[in-house]
Curated annotation (Swiss-Prot):
GO terms for cellular component: cytosol. Belongs to the class-II aminoacyl-tRNA synthetase family. Keywords: Aminoacyl-tRNA synthetase, ATP-binding, Cytoplasm, Ligase, Metal-binding, Nucleotide-binding, Protein biosynthesis, RNA-binding, tRNA-binding, Zinc. It catalyses: tRNA(Ala) + L-alanine + ATP = L-alanyl-tRNA(Ala) + AMP + diphosphate. Coiled coil: none annotated. InterPro entries: aa-tRNA-synth_II/BPL/LPL, Ala-tRNA-lgiase_IIc, Ala-tRNA-ligase_IIc_anticod-bd, Ala-tRNA-synth_IIc_core, Ala-tRNA-synth_IIc_N, Ala-tRNA_ligase, Ala_tRNA_ligase_euk/bac, DHHA1_dom. Consists of three domains; the N-terminal catalytic domain, the editing domain and the C-terminal C-Ala domain. The editing domain removes incorrectly charged amino acids, while the C-Ala domain, along with tRNA(Ala), serves as a bridge to cooperatively bring together the editing and aminoacylation centers thus stimulating deacylation of misacylated tRNAs. This is Alanine--tRNA ligase. Binds 1 zinc ion per subunit. Its cofactor is Zn(2+). Zn(2+) binds at H573, H577, C675, H679.
Length: 890
């Protein structure tokens, strides 16, 4: 039975029994405690916790899941995989143990021609929790499972919880006996390789408290209602129904193995080591495609790191199998072909998935060889010194410079019999993060110590921000810092940081830079505010200089921002939102914001994309943005619950932690984002947006630079002036410029070719004369000399090789020519095969010459290049070459 049919029968069976079919949620968990969805119940977690009332009493789903804790075991065992599909049925206060058990038995044992899976009841074994008499009674008396095939196990095996206080309960597992060829008999309590678990029924009826381990926690009492959460591993059931040895050989996986064998020429089943690599490739490529399909892009943190890690393991294992060229596209295509029937969105999104995967493959292949060489050298050095642990600094170098995930280094070191100093590696990583954090903080505050700000916050409370509705107001100074130290007062000329009880100044955050302005103290003192930061939550710090008078803590003040500057920043920030939405419209949801900076009249916007955005797409994005400006759309901000924001479709990183209340900025019917920044009131106030271009700032991240309003107009005006000047030079209209400039460049290229031809002729003429000057040194035809100054390195090399080629008759030949370029000596030396057979290598000769010239050089045995600092020593260098030829020639 094909996997797609297993899935169809599952959903059909439960739908016929009153369950609502719920589509698989994204692998990107809508839960700040999870990177990825690891189980079928995760999307239903709010219902089990009682946070949200379920819209139906019964539900069923086939949920995409990813688990990576046992990634090193993938391929080595038949039970570990990173991607799997969890078939689940759920009851929220409806049926309980008897209903769940009855449904499960019916679906598993009903003959296939009657809609079931047709498993032999005699091969099914049951485990129940140690004290769960009720479940055992149902299995034995209601279902008819013999008592000898029901086993009781403890909390570790048959009691489920999420690992934290919350819902929990005993569970009952259904296991399938694969037969004596898989090990000794005795049931799942004895051999879980032979008696493989296929279905877990969780009877969620209690609430657990704190605990120290999986089987050590307190049961606090009953839940308000009893729930059912079951999970059947589709891949494990497919393994049984398709009669194969392991999960890697089922229909949706075997096709990938076959493609990998086709690409490498290594047959599956030929050897244990190659089989492990083939299974790793199969599992990891399936997982990669599903993750990319759900919007994950490779990166160095979070779920992006998970994807990068498994993709690079797959690529490296293909290299171990003998692949030499790119392989990812072929593997991606076969995964989509296999999984597309169940998840048609993979087919429609094929181009984007391929683009992301190919970009990661290209990035890794650039560093794989060099990184592997670094690792091999480190391993050799470690072994030579008698060590068994690869130093942490080597692992850090591989990660930081060559993009090797630490897991890959661990694996490759283990293959050579070494462990890795993980503590040392993590210490260096921590130091790097702390340096970056301190650098970023010191750039904002001038120092990295935040204690003074916290003391002010503890004493005076958080700053009341009034800047959404006011640009000026009355305030009280509650804190003064001079050189990062709290002070009761500051005087004229002091650089200060002022904390107010209330302020209209926006503190840098969310990509928007801080406001500037003035603080006028009641005593007459004036502070010019040059920046506003929020170094700790809730504390607004106004950085500036006391221009007049003395400032004291507790003084009343009139504060005002630079309104013109604020408006220019607001235009940039609103334009950023429009750009974000236009990019998502053009490229899809993966063009998610990765960073931004909004300044007066200009902004930059970073977003996820595996490759450069075509110019035509950028043009369309810019046009769409400016069309929105012309629609005079209102811009509104509203504070609401995070759940309401999600419901309204507001763009946000919902994997991040937000408070219960969030601010949502809506631009007409075009854009809706969570945002704490300041904005225009209407899109017409932006005037004009001009995208200057986009570029790469890292793997999978692109950056757009843009201008807004008057700055955009001034840019276009300058461009118009430049175009007019070019028109005057080439005597053409604007629309003719590309053709005319192209023609001029063509003529220039032709002229360069003609110059190159003359240069080549000059080299040939010089070569003929040099051959005639060859000197016989112990049977070696030695040509030496100095050619005119200014001869390029390429021309000198071309001349040397031409002279070498003109020495006929099989005579051993050495050609050593010198010149000066930019006042510094340069030499190229070449030997023919006959000379090399007599022990003369170009690299050795160049090093001897370059040493005399006060420099260095090297190259291959047949041709090498060197240079130095002393052109006056060229004659001595020629003599050094001749001496070495005389001494070395055999």
């Amino acid at each position: 039975m094909e996997s797609a049919e297993i899935r169809r029968r599952w959903l059909s069976f439960y739908e016929e029994r009153g369950h609502t079919v719920v589509p698989s949620a994204s692998l990107i968990a809508d839960d700040p405690t999870l990177l990825l969805v690891p189980a079928g119940m995760v999307p239903f977690k709010p219902y089990f916790l009682g946070e949200v009332k379920p819209p139906w009493p019964r539900a069923t789903s086939v949920q995409k899941c990813v688990r990576t804790p046992d990634i090193e075991e993938v391929g080595k065992t038949t039970r570990h995989g990173t991607f799997f599909q969890m078939c689940g049925n759920f009851s929220f206060g409806d049926y309980f143990k008897e209903g769940a058990i009855t449904y499960a038995w019916e679906l598993l044992t009903t003959p296939q021609d009657k809609g079931g899976y047709g498993l032999d009841p005699e091969r099914l074994w049951i485990t129940v929790y140690l004290d769960d008499d009720e479940a055992e009674t149902i299995w034995r008396d209601k279902i008819g499972v013999p008592a000898e095939r029901i086993q009781r196990l403890g909390k570790k095996d048959n009691y489920w919880s999420m690992g934290v206080p919350g819902p929990c309960g005993p569970c009952s597992e259904i296991n399938y006996d694969r037969g004596p060829e898989f090990g000794v008999e005795g049931g799942p309590a004895v051999n879980d390789e032979r008696y493989v678990e296929i279905w877990n029924l969780v009877f969620m009826q209690y609430e657990r408290g704190e605990g120290t381990s999986k089987d050590d926690f307190e049961i606090l009492g009953d839940l308000p209602q009893k729930n059912i959460d079951t999970g059947l591993g589709m891949e494990r059931l497919a393994m049984i129904l398709q009669g194969v040895q392991n999960m890697y050989e089922i229909d949706t996986s075997m096709a990938v193995i076959q493609k990998a064998t086709e690409l490498t020429g290594v047959e599956y089943g030929a050897a244990h080591g190659s089989d492990v690599s083939l299974r790793v490739v199969t599992d990891h490529m399936r997982t990669s495609v599903m993750l990319i399909g759900d919007g994950v892009t490779p990166g160095n943190e979070g779920r992006g790191y998970v994807l990068r890690r498994i993709m690079r393991r797959a690529i490296r294992n293909m290299r171990l199998l003998g692949a030499t060229g790119p392989v990812v596209k072929d593997l991606v295509d076969v995964v989509i072909a296999m999984m597309g029937q169940q998840y048609p969105e993979l087919i429609s999104d094929r181009q984007r998935i391929e683009t992301v995967a190919l970009a990661e493959e290209a990035a890794f292949l650039k560093t794989l060889k060099a990184g592997t060489n670094i690792l091999d050298t480190a391993v050799t050095e470690t072994k030579a010194s008698g060590g068994q642990v690869l130093p942490g600094d080597k692992a850090f170098l591989l990660h930081d410079t060559w993009g090797f995930p630490i897991d890959l280094t661990l694996e490759m070191a283990a293959e050579q019999g070494l462990s890795v100093d993980e503590d040392g590696f993590r210490r260096l990583m921590k130091e790097q993060r702390e340096r970056a954090k301190a650098d970023a903080q010191s750039k904002k505050t001038g120092h990295a110590d935040l204690g003074a700000y916290r003391e002010i916050a503890d004493a005076a409370g958080e700053t009341d921000f009034i800047g959404y509705t006011q640009t000026e107001g009355e305030s009280t100074i509650v804190g003064i810092l001079v050189d990062g130290v709290s002070s009761p007062a500051a005087t004229e000329g002091d650089e200060v940081e002022i904390v107010l009880d209330r302020t209209p100044f926006y503190a840098e955050g969310g990509g928007q830079i801080g406001d500037t302005g003035r603080i006028k103290v009641e005593s007459g003192a004036i502070i010019e505010v040059r920046d506003c930061q929020k170094p700790v939550p809730g504390v607004y710090v106004h950085k500036g200089v006391v221009q007049v008078g003395e400032v004291t803590v507790g003084a009343k003040a009139q504060v005002s921002i630079d309104v013109r500057r604020r408006k220019a920043i607001a235009r940039a920030h609103s334009a950023t939102h429009l750009t974000h939405q236009a990019l998502r419209d053009a490229l899809g949801p993966t063009a998610a914001q990765a960073g931004s900076e909004n300044q007066p009249g200009r902004f930059r916007f970073d977003f996820g994309s595996p490759s450069a955005v075509p110019t035509t797409v950028m043009t369309d994005v810019e046009q769409q943005i400016n069309e929105v400006l012309a629609r005079d759309l209102d811009v509104q901000a509203e504070v609401m619950s995070i759940d309401e924001a999600k419901k309204q479709g507001a763009i946000a990183e919902f994997g991040e932690k937000y408070g219960e209340r969030v601010r949502v900025v809506t631009i007409g019917d075009f854009s809706k984002e969570l945002c704490g920044g300041t904005h225009v009131h209407n899109t017409a106030q932006l005037g004009l947006v001009k995208l200057l271009g986009e570029s790469s700032i890292g793997s999978g991240v692109r950056r757009i630079e843009a201008l807004v309003g008057v700055d955009a107009y001034n840019f276009l005006a300058r461009e118009h002036t430049v175009v007019a000047q070019i028109q005057e030079l080439v005597k053409g209209r604007p629309e003719e410029l590309p053709e005319k400039v192209s023609a001029m460049l063509g003529k220039l290229k032709d002229a360069e070719k003609e110059i190159e031809r003359f240069r080549a002729e000059k080299v040939l003429q010089a070569a003929a004369g040099l051959v005639d000057s060859a000197k016989d040194v112990r049977g070696i035809a030695l040509v030496t000399g100095q050619v005119p100054d200014g001869t390029t390195a390429d021309d000198l090399r071309r001349l040397v090789l031409d002279v070498r080629g003109r020495i006929q008759g099989g005579r051993p030949a050495v050609v050593a020519l010198f010149t000066t370029v930019g006042g510094k000596p340069l030499t190229v030396i070449a030997t023919n095969e006959a000379a090399r057979e007599r022990g003369l290598k170009a690299g050795d000769l160049v090093r001897a010459a370059a040493k005399t010239l006060g420099g260095g050089g090297g190259g291959k045995p047949d041709v090498a290049q060197g240079g130095g600092q002393n052109p006056a020593a060229i004659g001595e260098a020629i003599d050094a070459v001749e001496r070495l030829v005389t001494e070395t020639a055999k």
